[in-house]
Amino acid sequence: LFIDRSGIPLAFCIHPGNTNEQTTLIPLEEQILRDFSLSKFIVCTDAGLSSERNRKFNNFGGRCFITTQSIKKLKKDLRQWCLEPTGWHLKDSLDTYDISRLEDTAKNRSRLFYKQLYVEGNDGKRDIDFDQTLIVTYSLKYRNYQQQIRNQQISRAMKAIDTEPKRIDKHSQNDYRRFIKKTSITADGECAANKIYEIDQDAVQEEAQYDGFYAVYTNLDDDPSEIAAVNQGRWEIEESFRIMKSEFEARPVYLKRDDRIKAHF
């Protein structure tokens, strides 16, 4: 779904549920270029659409991008730079901050700390520069929110260990059961007759280190805090999908032919 800055839908395309969404962005952009005769626009996407191929496509022809970047998937040196507690900034301030020393106060919870790193690159296919800025933000409010969600998931995981052991082994990437560790051997290395389930504290700590952090790649030269604010506006797309599923009752779809599925939406 493409929307403008006011949240008004511009274009919508439908794909089978098993389609890799990264491959859907460029064809839809090309359609918008034809239909709306747009010469310039800024594409703002979540991490699911943030492939290097898509970013390079939006690095020429008057197009720009702001795309979410998973910190976990960055190279080790960039990941360490993102999580480094020193060298953070605030909008309209010349000071630098150490986020490890922040007190959890109302004032600090309302602040958005950031830092940026210029990353040089090249688009060999088009023989042009592919330079990006990696912008990382840190928010105590976002950190507390992520901690709250994870604590709720850990509580569900503990309950599952006690009541639903047969369902523990099957889980998705963000499922609460990812925090459950299974042991099938004894301390002596022998096969155990029963599986032992417990909370995986290593997995909890690994995930907790990213609490409060958020990263984007962009080829814009604007103020980092302004770019972060634009990216946060993506919630309007999620809101549009919620409206379709609730008020518009767009799902479930009891149709099979592609033309009728499109007509339904």
PLM regions: where:
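Anion-binding and metal-coordination hotspots
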Residues: 1-265
